[in-house]
Amino acid sequence: MKVLCLGNNTLDTDDRCRAVAQSLGIDHRGLVSSFDHSQGAWHTSVMDLGRGDIIELAKQADRVLMLAQPLSAWSHPDSWLRTVEIIDEVNGEFQDQDAVSRYRYWQRVLETNPGFCILPWVEHMTRNDYAVLCCRSHKPVTKCLSVDDWAHDAGYQAIRADMLQGHTRPDHCDACYQQEAVSSSSDRYRETLEWTNRLKLDSLADLDSIREPVYFEMRASNKCNLKCRTCGPEYSHLIAHERKAMQILPANYRAERNNNRFESMPMHTMRKLYVAGGEPLIMPEFIGFLNRARDAGYRDFELVINTNCTTLTDQFRDLIQDFNNVTFIVSIDGVGAVNDYIRSNSQWYKILSNLHWLNDHKFHISINTVVSTYNAARLHEIFQWLDQDFPDIGVNLMTAFSADNLFDALHHGNLDLVRQSVQHALATKSVNNGPTSRRWLQDFLQQIGHRENHVFAYENFLAYNTRLDDHRGTCLGKILPELIDRKLQ
C-alpha cells in the first residue's frame, strides 16, 4: 500500500506521517518528490511541491490523507486551504473532519445563496473618487470614505443586507455572475472561502464582528509601459495617448487617479494588499509606500503585485526582499513573439530573465492569461512552456472583456484549431498547478462545442486590429498567421 500524507512543511508532518505508517503496519518513507516501487507512507506539502505534482502523486497512491494539524500550525492560511482543495479534487481523506467543518459551512452558503460574497465585509477599494466593491466592479458604492466610515456606510450596509437575504446585485457583481454562467466557480467563491478561513468565521453571524477592512486593492493610476491589445485607456496611459491620436478615445474616458491613497493606507489593519495598474513597478507612489512600510516594521502582510514583469530595477529587487509574504501575478498572454505582439512594447527575453530571478529568490508566482481571439489557438504553448521552464507555476485564465465583445475567443475564425489547443493544454502537467485552470479549460471546451463561427464579429475584430497594426507598424499575419490564413474555415 502507498499512502500519501499532505500537511504543512514542518517536522510535525514527518512525525504524523510516521504515526500513520505505524497504525497501518507499513514503512515510513518520509518526504516524497516521486514514488519508487516501494510500499509505505510518504508525505509532502503545497510548499514543497506544486499542485500539479501533488495531483500526479495522488494518482499513484492507494490512499491520500490530509493530516490533522491545527490551522495555527500552518505558515499561511492559504496553504491549508489549497491543501483542502487538493484533497477534495483527488477524493482524499481528512484525518480530522472537524477541521474542515468551517470550509464545508461556507461551501453550503455559497451553493444556496447566489448573492453572497465576503468582500463587502472585508475589502476596501477605490476608483478615482468612489469606493467600489472590488476590482471586478466599476459601479460606485459611495463617495470615497475613510476606513472608519466603511463599516457603517449606508451604501455598503444596503449591499450587505441584500447579500444576506440572497438577493443578487448584478449592478455591482455581474462579473462573477457571468463566470458562474459558464463555469462551476467564480471569484466570489474563491474569495469567500479564502477570507472566512483566514478570519476564522464559523457562521454568517460572525460577520458582525468585523469592524474594519483587512483587504485593500489599489490601482494607483493608469501609468503603464505597455499597450496590450485587449486592454483599454483606463489601465494604460500609452493606450489613452494612442487612441486619442487615432480619434477613438471615448468621450467619457477618465484615467484612474488614486496616487495619494498609498499615503493614507492603514498599515495596522492590513492583512492583504493587492496592487495593480497600470504597471505598479514603474509607479513611484507604490515604491514609496513599500519604503514606508518597511521602515515602520510592517513586513508581514500579504502583498500581491500584478505586474507585466518587464521592469525589475535593482532598487526594487533590494526592497522587495525585505517583505515576508509576496506574490507576483505575472501577466503573460503568449510565448515569445506572440506575447510581445499581443502585449505591445514587451520584450520576452526581459520577462524570462525577471521571472527566473523571482523564481530563484523563492517568491510566490502565478501567471495571469487573458484569453482572447488573439491567443485562443495558442493556449497550449503557454502551458507547454511552463512544463519545461517553470513546472511549479500555475496559470489563472480569464476572459478578455470589451463592451462589444470584440475580443471574444469564441468568435475565433477557426474554432477547430482552438479546440485542439485547449485539448493539448489539458494534457500538460502545469494545467493542474492553477486552482481553476483545468476546470476553466474544460468549461471553455464545452462552450466551443455549442458555438458557431460569427463571421460579422470576427470581421470586426480583424478590422480593428488592422487599424492598430497600421498605427503601430506591426503585422498580425507574421505573428499569428492562423488568424489570417485559416479564417472561418
PLM regions: where:
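A short, aliphatic-rich alpha-helical micro-motif
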Residues: 58-59, 267
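Recognition helices and adjacent regulatory flanks at domain boundaries
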Residues: 104, 181-214, 224-226, 245-249, ...
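Conserved C-terminal portion of the radical SAM core fold
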Residues: 128, 304, 323-329, 349-483
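N-terminal pre-triad scaffold of radical SAM enzymes
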Residues: 116-131, 206-234, 270-274
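Short, basic/aromatic recognition patches
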Residues: 101-118
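Core AdoMet radical
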Residues: 213-223, 234-257, 268-283, 296-313, ...
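Membrane-interface junctions of multi-pass transporters
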Residues: 137-182, 484-488
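Local cysteine-cluster metal-coordination motifs and their immediate loop/turn environment
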Residues: 133, 169-181, 223-233
